[in-house]
Protein backbone atom coordinates (compact mmCIF):
# COMPACT_ATOMS: atom_id res chain seq x y z
CA UNK A 1 0.00 0.00 0.00
CA UNK A 2 1.22 3.48 -0.89
CA UNK A 3 0.28 6.43 1.32
CA UNK A 4 1.24 10.08 1.36
CA UNK A 5 3.00 11.44 4.40
CA UNK A 6 -0.17 13.42 5.18
CA UNK A 7 -2.18 10.18 5.27
CA UNK A 8 0.31 8.56 7.63
CA UNK A 9 0.12 11.62 9.87
CA UNK A 10 -3.69 11.74 9.95
CA UNK A 11 -4.16 8.01 10.43
CA UNK A 12 -1.54 7.96 13.17
CA UNK A 13 -3.36 10.75 15.00
CA UNK A 14 -6.56 8.73 14.82
CA UNK A 15 -4.74 5.58 16.00
CA UNK A 16 -3.49 7.56 18.97
CA UNK A 17 -7.02 8.52 20.00
CA UNK A 18 -7.41 11.94 18.37
CA UNK A 19 -10.92 12.87 17.24
CA UNK A 20 -10.61 16.63 16.63
CA UNK A 21 -7.91 18.78 15.10
CA UNK A 22 -8.03 22.46 16.06
CA UNK A 23 -6.50 24.35 13.18
CA UNK A 24 -6.24 27.37 10.94
CA UNK A 25 -5.52 26.58 7.30
CA UNK A 26 -2.37 27.59 5.45
CA UNK A 27 -0.35 26.59 2.41
CA UNK A 28 1.94 24.15 4.21
CA UNK A 29 -0.81 21.98 5.69
CA UNK A 30 -3.48 21.75 2.96
CA UNK A 31 -2.68 18.04 2.34
CA UNK A 32 -3.44 17.27 6.00
CA UNK A 33 -6.94 18.70 5.63
CA UNK A 34 -7.47 16.31 2.72
CA UNK A 35 -6.05 13.34 4.64
CA UNK A 36 -8.28 14.08 7.63
CA UNK A 37 -11.35 13.07 5.61
CA UNK A 38 -10.35 9.42 5.25
CA UNK A 39 -8.94 9.32 8.81
CA UNK A 40 -12.32 10.52 10.16
CA UNK A 41 -10.75 13.43 12.01
CA UNK A 42 -12.96 16.41 12.71
CA UNK A 43 -11.45 19.67 11.50
CA UNK A 44 -12.32 22.57 13.82
CA UNK A 45 -11.28 25.60 11.79
CA UNK A 46 -10.68 28.68 13.95
CA UNK A 47 -10.05 32.39 13.39
CA UNK A 48 -6.65 32.67 15.12
CA UNK A 49 -3.96 30.09 15.79
CA UNK A 50 -3.71 31.06 19.45
CA UNK A 51 -7.36 30.12 19.88
CA UNK A 52 -6.67 26.68 18.42
CA UNK A 53 -3.88 26.07 20.93
CA UNK A 54 -6.18 27.08 23.77
CA UNK A 55 -8.88 24.74 22.44
CA UNK A 56 -6.43 21.85 22.23
CA UNK A 57 -5.37 22.65 25.80
CA UNK A 58 -8.95 22.53 27.13
CA UNK A 59 -9.66 19.36 25.17
CA UNK A 60 -6.64 17.68 26.75
CA UNK A 61 -7.62 18.72 30.26
CA UNK A 62 -11.17 17.41 29.89
CA UNK A 63 -10.49 14.17 28.01
CA UNK A 64 -6.97 13.33 29.29
CA UNK A 65 -6.10 12.61 25.64
CA UNK A 66 -3.75 15.02 23.88
CA UNK A 67 -5.51 17.90 22.19
CA UNK A 68 -4.24 18.39 18.64
CA UNK A 69 -3.41 21.82 17.21
CA UNK A 70 -2.31 22.15 13.58
CA UNK A 71 -0.87 25.27 11.93
CA UNK A 72 0.93 26.40 8.85
CA UNK A 73 4.58 27.33 9.24
CA UNK A 74 6.22 30.65 9.99
CA UNK A 75 3.67 33.22 11.19
CA UNK A 76 1.00 30.57 11.76
CA UNK A 77 3.39 28.66 13.99
CA UNK A 78 4.42 31.85 15.78
CA UNK A 79 0.79 32.78 16.49
CA UNK A 80 0.14 29.37 17.98
CA UNK A 81 3.15 29.21 20.30
CA UNK A 82 2.10 31.76 22.95
CA UNK A 83 -0.64 29.68 24.66
CA UNK A 84 1.71 26.71 25.02
CA UNK A 85 2.95 28.24 28.27
CA UNK A 86 -0.57 28.08 29.69
CA UNK A 87 -0.86 24.41 28.71
CA UNK A 88 2.58 23.60 30.14
CA UNK A 89 1.79 25.18 33.50
CA UNK A 90 -1.65 23.53 33.55
CA UNK A 91 -0.07 20.10 32.90
CA UNK A 92 -2.30 19.63 29.87
CA UNK A 93 -1.51 16.95 27.24
CA UNK A 94 -1.31 18.64 23.85
CA UNK A 95 0.42 18.09 20.52
CA UNK A 96 1.11 21.12 18.33
CA UNK A 97 1.87 20.31 14.70
CA UNK A 98 3.28 22.96 12.38
CA UNK A 99 4.01 23.02 8.69
CA UNK A 100 7.57 23.95 7.83
CA UNK A 101 9.78 24.97 4.93
CA UNK A 102 10.64 21.93 2.72
CA UNK A 103 13.69 19.93 3.76
CA UNK A 104 15.73 20.91 0.71
CA UNK A 105 15.19 24.61 1.49
CA UNK A 106 16.23 24.53 5.14
CA UNK A 107 18.89 27.17 5.76
CA UNK A 108 18.32 28.86 2.38
CA UNK A 109 15.78 31.49 3.48
CA UNK A 110 12.83 29.51 2.17
CA UNK A 111 9.30 30.90 2.35
CA UNK A 112 8.35 31.60 5.99
CA UNK A 113 11.42 29.78 7.26
CA UNK A 114 11.90 29.93 11.03
CA UNK A 115 13.73 27.85 13.60
CA UNK A 116 10.35 26.64 14.73
CA UNK A 117 11.43 23.80 16.99
CA UNK A 118 13.79 26.15 18.84
CA UNK A 119 11.03 28.75 19.17
CA UNK A 120 8.60 26.30 20.78
CA UNK A 121 11.15 24.44 22.92
CA UNK A 122 10.99 26.51 26.14
CA UNK A 123 7.20 26.08 26.37
CA UNK A 124 6.94 22.33 25.71
CA UNK A 125 8.21 19.00 27.00
CA UNK A 126 9.83 18.14 23.66
CA UNK A 127 10.21 19.85 20.29
CA UNK A 128 11.69 18.60 17.03
CA UNK A 129 11.42 18.65 13.23
CA UNK A 130 10.41 15.58 11.23
CA UNK A 131 12.97 14.22 8.77
CA UNK A 132 11.13 11.50 6.86
CA UNK A 133 7.61 10.91 5.51
CA UNK A 134 7.91 7.20 6.31
CA UNK A 135 8.69 8.00 9.95
CA UNK A 136 5.83 10.47 10.51
CA UNK A 137 3.81 7.81 12.29
CA UNK A 138 6.66 7.24 14.72
CA UNK A 139 6.97 11.00 15.23
CA UNK A 140 3.26 11.31 16.04
CA UNK A 141 3.36 8.32 18.39
CA UNK A 142 6.36 9.74 20.21
CA UNK A 143 4.69 13.16 20.50
CA UNK A 144 1.47 11.74 21.92
CA UNK A 145 3.34 9.42 24.27
CA UNK A 146 5.51 12.22 25.65
CA UNK A 147 2.46 14.48 26.06
CA UNK A 148 0.72 11.81 28.13
CA UNK A 149 3.67 10.51 30.16
CA UNK A 150 4.94 11.73 33.52
CA UNK A 151 3.71 15.26 34.16
CA UNK A 152 1.40 15.75 31.14
CA UNK A 153 2.15 18.69 28.91
CA UNK A 154 2.48 20.06 25.38
CA UNK A 155 4.79 18.71 22.68
CA UNK A 156 5.72 20.33 19.36
CA UNK A 157 6.47 18.72 16.00
CA UNK A 158 7.35 20.71 12.88
CA UNK A 159 6.78 18.89 9.58
CA UNK A 160 8.46 20.03 6.36
CA UNK A 161 5.76 20.54 3.75
CA UNK A 162 7.37 18.26 1.16
CA UNK A 163 6.84 15.29 3.49
CA UNK A 164 3.06 15.65 3.32
CA UNK A 165 2.81 14.80 -0.39
CA UNK A 166 5.75 12.40 -0.44
CA UNK A 167 4.61 8.86 -1.37
CA UNK A 168 5.59 6.07 1.01
CA UNK A 169 5.69 2.60 -0.54
CA UNK A 170 4.71 -0.35 1.64
CA UNK A 171 3.11 1.97 4.19
CA UNK A 172 1.16 -0.82 5.93
CA UNK A 173 3.60 -0.75 8.84
CA UNK A 174 4.08 3.02 8.90
CA UNK A 175 1.28 3.58 11.40
CA UNK A 176 2.44 2.38 14.83
CA UNK A 177 0.45 0.03 17.04
CA UNK A 178 -1.77 1.60 19.69
CA UNK A 179 0.71 0.83 22.48
CA UNK A 180 3.25 3.22 20.97
CA UNK A 181 0.96 6.19 21.71
CA UNK A 182 0.30 5.32 25.36
CA UNK A 183 1.95 6.87 28.39
CA UNK A 184 5.05 5.24 29.80
CA UNK A 185 3.89 4.23 33.30
CA UNK A 186 5.71 5.14 36.49
CA UNK A 187 3.70 3.50 39.30
CA UNK A 188 4.02 4.11 43.01
CA UNK A 189 5.14 1.00 44.87
CA UNK A 190 2.80 -0.26 47.59
CA UNK A 191 5.72 -0.27 50.04
CA UNK A 192 6.28 3.44 49.40
CA UNK A 193 2.56 4.16 49.71
CA UNK A 194 2.51 2.35 53.06
CA UNK A 195 5.38 4.54 54.27
CA UNK A 196 3.54 7.69 53.18
CA UNK A 197 0.32 6.61 54.89
CA UNK A 198 2.28 5.76 58.04
CA UNK A 199 3.91 9.21 58.04
CA UNK A 200 0.50 10.83 57.65
CA UNK A 201 -0.87 8.78 60.53
CA UNK A 202 1.98 9.82 62.84
CA UNK A 203 1.68 13.51 62.02
CA UNK A 204 -0.47 15.75 64.19
CA UNK A 205 -1.51 18.22 61.51
CA UNK A 206 -0.91 16.68 58.06
CA UNK A 207 -1.96 18.00 54.66
CA UNK A 208 -1.99 16.56 51.15
CA UNK A 209 -1.53 19.12 48.37
CA UNK A 210 -2.31 18.25 44.75
CA UNK A 211 -1.69 20.12 41.50
CA UNK A 212 -3.19 20.64 38.05
CA UNK A 213 -2.93 17.01 36.92
CA UNK A 214 -5.66 16.28 39.48
CA UNK A 215 -8.06 18.83 37.92
CA UNK A 216 -9.98 16.41 35.70
CA UNK A 217 -12.95 14.29 36.74
CA UNK A 218 -10.81 11.32 37.76
CA UNK A 219 -8.52 13.57 39.76
CA UNK A 220 -11.46 15.07 41.63
CA UNK A 221 -12.80 11.59 42.46
CA UNK A 222 -9.41 10.55 43.80
CA UNK A 223 -9.04 13.70 45.89
CA UNK A 224 -12.38 13.01 47.53
CA UNK A 225 -11.57 9.32 48.06
CA UNK A 226 -8.14 10.01 49.55
CA UNK A 227 -9.61 12.50 52.01
CA UNK A 228 -12.32 10.01 52.99
CA UNK A 229 -10.09 6.98 53.56
CA UNK A 230 -7.42 8.89 55.48
CA UNK A 231 -9.48 11.58 57.22
CA UNK A 232 -6.76 14.05 56.17
CA UNK A 233 -7.36 17.32 54.28
CA UNK A 234 -6.59 17.04 50.56
CA UNK A 235 -6.23 20.41 48.83
CA UNK A 236 -6.26 21.08 45.10
CA UNK A 237 -4.20 23.98 43.78
CA UNK A 238 -4.10 25.35 40.21
CA UNK A 239 -4.17 29.13 40.62
CA UNK A 240 -1.25 31.50 40.02
CA UNK A 241 -2.39 33.17 43.24
CA UNK A 242 -1.34 30.04 45.08
CA UNK A 243 -2.28 30.02 48.75
CA UNK A 244 -4.12 33.31 48.17
CA UNK A 245 -6.48 31.67 45.67
CA UNK A 246 -9.94 32.89 46.75
CA UNK A 247 -11.35 29.45 45.88
CA UNK A 248 -9.38 28.15 48.88
CA UNK A 249 -10.98 30.64 51.25
CA UNK A 250 -8.83 31.43 54.27
CA UNK A 251 -6.58 28.37 53.94
CA UNK A 252 -3.48 30.57 54.19
CA UNK A 253 -4.44 31.17 57.82
CA UNK A 254 -3.82 27.52 58.77
CA UNK A 255 -0.92 26.37 56.58
CA UNK A 256 1.71 27.40 59.10
CA UNK A 257 0.18 24.94 61.59
CA UNK A 258 0.89 21.91 59.37
CA UNK A 259 3.67 19.60 60.55
CA UNK A 260 3.69 17.29 57.50
CA UNK A 261 2.80 18.13 53.89
CA UNK A 262 2.53 15.49 51.18
CA UNK A 263 3.09 17.00 47.74
CA UNK A 264 1.15 14.69 45.42
CA UNK A 265 2.21 15.86 41.98
CA UNK A 266 2.27 19.42 43.31
CA UNK A 267 5.41 21.43 42.67
CA UNK A 268 7.00 23.22 45.61
CA UNK A 269 7.02 26.48 43.70
CA UNK A 270 6.00 30.13 43.97
CA UNK A 271 2.37 29.16 44.64
CA UNK A 272 3.53 27.64 47.95
CA UNK A 273 6.11 30.33 48.68
CA UNK A 274 8.69 27.56 48.16
CA UNK A 275 7.70 25.93 51.45
CA UNK A 276 9.46 28.59 53.47
CA UNK A 277 8.45 30.46 56.65
CA UNK A 278 6.23 32.18 57.49
CA UNK A 279 3.90 30.37 55.05
CA UNK A 280 5.01 27.03 56.49
CA UNK A 281 6.60 26.39 59.85
CA UNK A 282 10.36 25.92 59.70
CA UNK A 283 9.93 22.49 61.29
CA UNK A 284 7.29 21.32 58.81
CA UNK A 285 8.38 18.18 56.96
CA UNK A 286 7.57 17.30 53.36
CA UNK A 287 6.90 14.13 51.40
CA UNK A 288 7.12 14.54 47.64
CA UNK A 289 5.61 12.20 45.06
CA UNK A 290 6.26 13.57 41.59
CA UNK A 291 6.71 12.20 38.07
CA UNK A 292 9.63 14.55 37.46
CA UNK A 293 12.93 13.92 39.29
CA UNK A 294 14.00 17.48 38.50
CA UNK A 295 10.98 18.86 40.40
CA UNK A 296 12.07 16.84 43.42
CA UNK A 297 15.56 18.28 43.15
CA UNK A 298 14.23 21.83 42.90
CA UNK A 299 12.14 21.30 46.04
CA UNK A 300 15.20 20.21 47.99
CA UNK A 301 17.07 23.33 46.86
CA UNK A 302 14.12 25.58 47.71
CA UNK A 303 13.82 24.22 51.25
CA UNK A 304 17.55 24.37 51.85
CA UNK A 305 17.61 22.86 55.34
CA UNK A 306 18.50 19.15 55.25
CA UNK A 307 15.94 16.75 56.64
CA UNK A 308 12.83 18.73 55.75
CA UNK A 309 12.03 16.33 52.89
CA UNK A 310 11.62 12.97 54.60
CA UNK A 311 10.51 10.84 51.65
CA UNK A 312 10.50 11.17 47.87
CA UNK A 313 9.20 8.98 45.06
CA UNK A 314 9.16 9.33 41.29
CA UNK A 315 5.67 8.25 40.23
CA UNK A 316 2.76 9.35 38.07
CA UNK A 317 0.27 11.48 39.96
CA UNK A 318 -3.08 9.82 39.22
CA UNK A 319 -1.85 6.22 39.63
CA UNK A 320 -0.02 7.28 42.80
CA UNK A 321 -3.25 8.72 44.16
CA UNK A 322 -5.04 5.46 43.34
CA UNK A 323 -2.35 3.53 45.19
CA UNK A 324 -2.57 5.80 48.25
CA UNK A 325 -6.36 5.39 48.32
CA UNK A 326 -6.04 1.61 48.15
CA UNK A 327 -3.34 1.40 50.82
CA UNK A 328 -4.93 4.09 52.99
CA UNK A 329 -8.20 2.16 53.12
CA UNK A 330 -6.44 -0.52 55.20
CA UNK A 331 -6.36 1.87 58.17
CA UNK A 332 -9.21 3.54 59.99
CA UNK A 333 -9.48 7.22 59.00
CA UNK A 334 -8.35 9.72 61.61
CA UNK A 335 -10.98 11.78 63.37
CA UNK A 336 -9.77 15.00 64.95
CA UNK A 337 -10.32 18.73 64.90
CA UNK A 338 -7.46 19.48 62.50
CA UNK A 339 -9.32 18.35 59.40
CA UNK A 340 -12.37 20.40 60.35
CA UNK A 341 -10.15 23.43 61.01
CA UNK A 342 -8.75 23.20 57.48
CA UNK A 343 -12.12 22.58 55.85
CA UNK A 344 -13.65 25.44 57.82
CA UNK A 345 -10.89 27.76 56.59
CA UNK A 346 -11.50 26.69 52.99
CA UNK A 347 -15.26 27.23 53.31
CA UNK A 348 -14.93 30.62 54.95
CA UNK A 349 -16.33 33.61 53.08
CA UNK A 350 -16.84 36.97 54.81
CA UNK A 351 -20.41 37.53 55.99
CA UNK A 352 -20.61 40.86 54.19
CA UNK A 353 -20.51 39.05 50.84
CA UNK A 354 -24.22 38.37 51.19
CA UNK A 355 -24.90 42.10 51.47
CA UNK A 356 -22.67 42.84 48.49
CA UNK A 357 -24.56 40.32 46.39
CA UNK A 358 -27.97 41.84 47.04
CA UNK A 359 -27.41 45.59 47.28
CA UNK A 360 -28.76 48.03 44.70
CA UNK A 361 -26.59 50.02 42.30
CA UNK A 362 -23.60 48.75 40.34
CA UNK A 363 -23.42 44.97 40.18
CA UNK A 364 -20.75 43.65 42.52
CA UNK A 365 -18.75 40.71 41.10
CA UNK A 366 -19.84 38.53 44.02
CA UNK A 367 -23.44 38.91 42.82
CA UNK A 368 -22.40 37.38 39.51
CA UNK A 369 -20.66 34.58 41.39
CA UNK A 370 -23.77 33.86 43.44
CA UNK A 371 -25.95 33.75 40.32
CA UNK A 372 -23.61 31.30 38.60
CA UNK A 373 -23.32 29.28 41.83
CA UNK A 374 -27.10 28.95 42.00
CA UNK A 375 -27.20 27.83 38.37
CA UNK A 376 -24.63 25.10 39.04
CA UNK A 377 -26.67 23.93 42.02
CA UNK A 378 -29.48 23.22 39.55
CA UNK A 379 -27.17 21.79 36.87
CA UNK A 380 -24.24 20.07 38.62
CA UNK A 381 -23.06 18.46 35.38
CA UNK A 382 -22.27 21.83 33.82
CA UNK A 383 -18.68 22.88 33.06
CA UNK A 384 -17.34 26.10 34.57
CA UNK A 385 -14.64 28.04 32.72
CA UNK A 386 -12.85 31.00 34.29
CA UNK A 387 -10.73 33.66 32.60
CA UNK A 388 -9.45 37.11 33.48
CA UNK A 389 -8.09 38.82 36.56
CA UNK A 390 -9.87 40.45 39.48
CA UNK A 391 -13.52 39.95 38.51
CA UNK A 392 -13.33 36.20 37.94
CA UNK A 393 -11.58 35.67 41.28
CA UNK A 394 -14.86 36.61 42.96
CA UNK A 395 -16.74 34.19 40.74
CA UNK A 396 -14.27 31.35 41.30
CA UNK A 397 -14.58 31.86 45.03
CA UNK A 398 -18.36 31.52 44.78
CA UNK A 399 -18.84 28.64 42.34
CA UNK A 400 -18.38 25.00 43.36
CA UNK A 401 -18.25 23.21 40.02
CA UNK A 402 -17.43 19.53 39.64
CA UNK A 403 -15.64 20.32 36.36
CA UNK A 404 -13.80 23.56 35.78
CA UNK A 405 -11.13 24.97 33.48
CA UNK A 406 -9.10 28.01 34.53
CA UNK A 407 -6.09 29.82 33.16
CA UNK A 408 -4.00 27.71 35.54
CA UNK A 409 -0.71 28.46 37.30
CA UNK A 410 0.68 30.21 34.22
CA UNK A 411 -1.65 33.14 34.89
CA UNK A 412 -2.15 34.15 31.24
CA UNK A 413 -5.55 35.56 30.32
CA UNK A 414 -7.53 35.49 27.07
CA UNK A 415 -8.15 31.77 26.62
CA UNK A 416 -11.67 31.72 28.05
CA UNK A 417 -13.73 31.76 24.85
CA UNK A 418 -11.61 29.06 23.14
CA UNK A 419 -11.67 27.01 26.36
CA UNK A 420 -15.47 27.23 26.43
CA UNK A 421 -15.80 26.20 22.78
CA UNK A 422 -13.58 23.16 23.29
CA UNK A 423 -15.47 22.25 26.47
CA UNK A 424 -18.74 22.28 24.54
CA UNK A 425 -17.26 20.07 21.81
CA UNK A 426 -15.73 17.65 24.33
CA UNK A 427 -18.90 17.55 26.44
CA UNK A 428 -21.73 18.16 23.94
CA UNK A 429 -24.41 17.16 26.45
CA UNK A 430 -23.16 19.54 29.17
CA UNK A 431 -23.87 23.23 29.62
CA UNK A 432 -20.80 25.45 29.70
CA UNK A 433 -20.62 28.73 31.64
CA UNK A 434 -17.63 31.08 31.32
CA UNK A 435 -16.84 34.00 33.60
CA UNK A 436 -14.45 36.46 31.97
CA UNK A 437 -13.41 40.06 32.33
CA UNK A 438 -13.94 42.55 29.53
CA UNK A 439 -10.21 42.70 28.85
CA UNK A 440 -9.75 38.95 28.50
CA UNK A 441 -13.00 38.60 26.55
CA UNK A 442 -11.63 40.78 23.77
CA UNK A 443 -8.77 38.42 22.89
CA UNK A 444 -10.81 35.92 20.88
CA UNK A 445 -14.22 37.50 20.34
CA UNK A 446 -14.20 36.43 16.66
CA UNK A 447 -14.27 32.79 17.77
CA UNK A 448 -18.01 33.21 18.38
CA UNK A 449 -18.30 32.70 14.62
CA UNK A 450 -16.32 29.48 15.04
CA UNK A 451 -18.61 28.41 17.87
CA UNK A 452 -21.75 28.94 15.81
CA UNK A 453 -20.30 27.14 12.80
CA UNK A 454 -19.20 24.19 14.96
CA UNK A 455 -22.48 24.13 16.95
CA UNK A 456 -20.69 24.81 20.23
CA UNK A 457 -22.92 26.27 22.93
CA UNK A 458 -21.79 28.21 26.00
CA UNK A 459 -22.61 31.34 27.99
CA UNK A 460 -19.92 33.95 28.67
CA UNK A 461 -20.78 36.13 31.65
CA UNK A 462 -18.60 39.16 30.95
CA UNK A 463 -17.74 41.40 33.88
CA UNK A 464 -17.54 44.80 32.20
CA UNK A 465 -15.72 47.25 34.48
CA UNK A 466 -14.08 49.16 31.62
CA UNK A 467 -10.60 48.29 32.77
CA UNK A 468 -7.57 46.04 32.77
CA UNK A 469 -8.35 45.81 36.45
CA UNK A 470 -5.58 43.54 37.74
CA UNK A 471 -2.91 45.98 36.56
CA UNK A 472 -5.02 48.98 37.58
CA UNK A 473 -5.21 47.64 41.13
CA UNK A 474 -1.42 47.27 41.20
CA UNK A 475 -1.08 50.90 40.10
CA UNK A 476 -3.50 52.03 42.80
CA UNK A 477 -1.63 50.18 45.53
CA UNK A 478 1.82 51.22 44.32
CA UNK A 479 1.44 54.75 42.95
CA UNK A 480 -2.03 56.01 43.90
CA UNK A 481 -5.10 56.68 41.78
CA UNK A 482 -3.78 59.89 40.23
CA UNK A 483 -0.86 58.04 38.67
CA UNK A 484 -2.91 55.16 37.27
CA UNK A 485 -2.34 55.12 33.52
CA UNK A 486 -2.96 53.03 30.42
CA UNK A 487 -5.41 50.50 31.85
CA UNK A 488 -8.76 52.01 30.89
CA UNK A 489 -11.16 50.29 28.49
CA UNK A 490 -14.48 51.64 27.29
CA UNK A 491 -17.37 50.36 29.44
CA UNK A 492 -19.75 51.48 26.69
CA UNK A 493 -18.66 48.64 24.39
CA UNK A 494 -21.68 46.45 23.68
CA UNK A 495 -20.10 43.04 23.75
CA UNK A 496 -23.60 41.56 23.73
CA UNK A 497 -24.39 43.22 20.39
CA UNK A 498 -21.06 42.10 18.92
CA UNK A 499 -21.88 38.51 19.84
CA UNK A 500 -25.35 38.85 18.33
CA UNK A 501 -23.77 40.11 15.11
CA UNK A 502 -21.56 37.01 15.07
CA UNK A 503 -24.63 34.77 15.27
CA UNK A 504 -24.84 34.30 19.03
CA UNK A 505 -27.19 35.41 21.78
CA UNK A 506 -26.38 38.66 23.59
CA UNK A 507 -27.93 40.53 26.49
CA UNK A 508 -26.96 43.60 28.52
CA UNK A 509 -27.35 43.27 32.31
CA UNK A 510 -27.18 46.35 34.54
CA UNK A 511 -28.91 45.10 37.72
CA UNK A 512 -27.94 42.23 39.98
CA UNK A 513 -31.58 41.23 40.36
CA UNK A 514 -31.70 40.47 36.62
CA UNK A 515 -28.74 38.10 36.59
CA UNK A 516 -30.49 34.79 37.28
CA UNK A 517 -33.19 35.16 34.64
CA UNK A 518 -30.73 36.53 32.10
CA UNK A 519 -28.43 33.56 32.65
CA UNK A 520 -31.32 31.16 32.19
CA UNK A 521 -32.39 32.87 28.97
CA UNK A 522 -28.85 32.68 27.63
CA UNK A 523 -28.57 28.99 28.48
CA UNK A 524 -31.93 28.19 26.93
CA UNK A 525 -31.00 30.01 23.72
CA UNK A 526 -28.82 27.02 22.83
CA UNK A 527 -26.40 29.35 21.07
CA UNK A 528 -22.98 30.73 21.96
CA UNK A 529 -24.09 33.53 24.26
CA UNK A 530 -22.82 36.61 26.06
CA UNK A 531 -24.19 38.41 29.09
CA UNK A 532 -22.54 41.84 29.17
CA UNK A 533 -22.76 42.62 32.90
CA UNK A 534 -21.87 46.12 34.07
CA UNK A 535 -19.89 45.37 37.22
CA UNK A 536 -18.29 47.44 39.94
CA UNK A 537 -14.53 47.87 39.63
CA UNK A 538 -13.04 46.21 42.71
CA UNK A 539 -9.91 44.31 43.64
CA UNK A 540 -9.98 40.53 43.90
CA UNK A 541 -10.94 39.23 47.34
CA UNK A 542 -8.20 38.57 49.89
CA UNK A 543 -9.94 36.11 52.19
CA UNK A 544 -8.72 35.81 55.76
CA UNK A 545 -10.19 35.61 59.23
CA UNK A 546 -7.68 38.30 60.12
CA UNK A 547 -8.58 40.93 57.50
CA UNK A 548 -11.68 42.02 55.67
CA UNK A 549 -11.81 41.57 51.90
CA UNK A 550 -11.97 44.70 49.73
CA UNK A 551 -15.61 45.38 48.99
CA UNK A 552 -16.00 48.86 47.57
CA UNK A 553 -15.29 50.50 44.27
CA UNK A 554 -11.68 51.34 43.52
CA UNK A 555 -12.38 53.49 40.48
Q: What does each of the following model-derived ranges do?
A:
Residues 4, 134, 158, 171-172, ...:
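Phosphate/pyrophosphate-binding active-site segments
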Residues 84-86, 144-145, 276, 375-377, ...:
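Short amphipathic alpha-helices and their capping/turn segments at secondary-structure boundaries
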Residues 1-334, 457-460, 478:
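N-terminal alpha/beta PP-like core and its mobile active-site loop of ThDP/TPP-dependent enzymes
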Residues 6-9, 14, 24-37, 343-429:
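Active-site diphosphate/adenylate-binding microenvironment
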Residues 57, 117-118, 224, 370, ...:
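Active-site phosphate/pyrophosphate- and oxyanion-stabilizing loops and adjacent acidic/basic residues
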Residues 97, 105-112, 255, 314, ...:
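Thiamine diphosphate
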Residues 60, 147, 227, 373-377, ...:
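N-terminal cationic-hydrophobic initiation segments that often serve targeting/anchoring roles
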Residues 32, 166-169, 296-298, 347-349, ...:
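Short acidic/His/Gly/Ser-rich catalytic and metal-binding motifs that mark active-site loops
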Amino acid sequence: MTLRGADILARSLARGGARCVFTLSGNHIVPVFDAAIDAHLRIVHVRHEGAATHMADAWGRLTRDPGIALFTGGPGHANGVGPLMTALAAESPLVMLSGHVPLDQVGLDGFQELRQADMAAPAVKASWTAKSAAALGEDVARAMQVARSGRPGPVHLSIPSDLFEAPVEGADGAIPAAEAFRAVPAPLADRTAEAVIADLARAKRPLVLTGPTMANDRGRELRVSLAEVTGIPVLFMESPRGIADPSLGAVADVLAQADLVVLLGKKLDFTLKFGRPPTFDAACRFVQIDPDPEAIGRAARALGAPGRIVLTAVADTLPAAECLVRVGARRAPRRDGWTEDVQSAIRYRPAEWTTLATREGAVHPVAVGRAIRDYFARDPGAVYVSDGGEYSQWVQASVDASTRITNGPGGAIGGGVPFAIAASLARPDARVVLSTGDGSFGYHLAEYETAGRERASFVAVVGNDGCWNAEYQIQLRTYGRYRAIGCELSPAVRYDLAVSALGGYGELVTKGSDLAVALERAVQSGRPACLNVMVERVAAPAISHRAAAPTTSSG
